[in-house]
Amino acid sequence: MLQTQVLETARLIRTMPLNLAREITTKIADQHLKGVRASTLAAEILEQYPQLSKAKATLVARTEVARTNTMLLENDCHEVGAKWYVWRSTHDVRTRSSHNHMDGVVCSWDDPPNPEKLEGDDRDYGPYHPGCIFNCRCFPSPLVTVEQIPSNLKVHLHGTIVRMSKREFIQKHWKEVL
């Protein structure tokens, strides 16, 4: 899991050597678990790695904090058997249109969506969960009980978004969470 995160960080900062990306990612994960905010992490990154710009340090800190939050939540969900979540966006002018398009869509932890492709955007960042791409402030809202499932829902299944009733979703896709 950490190796994947390191490679993603290095991809974010193309000029960054892989060992530096590994150091920064490990530091961010450690500090974030202690409750340190993204802005504080960005300042610490700048202090330790002055070759980075303030904008890059902020981008990396914000992205890694969001990604770490999502990865920890995904791990917790797998532990309790929660296989689905609802994509939630922040509903403001800075939210990507592809992420607004995903807002309210029920997704599986095992099949992350490709929001840009689903919206027909030319950019393609591949499949990812909310919070797991640069500057994303979206978050997953886990579905743990049947009561949390929306009445009429949009569900991401195998690269498409389909509409279905709560009853249909439960019959076809829901397995009781322990």
Where would I find each of the regions flagged by the language model?
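Structured, charged N-terminal subsegments at the starts of enzyme catalytic cores
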Residues: 1-47
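Secondary-structure capping and boundary motifs in well-ordered enzyme cores
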Residues: 16-20, 53, 130
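Generic, well-ordered alpha-helical scaffold segments in large soluble proteins
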Residues: 19, 23, 27, 31, ...
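Short, basic interhelical loop/turn and adjoining N-cap
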Residues: 48-55
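Activation/maturation switch segments at domain boundaries
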Residues: 62-178
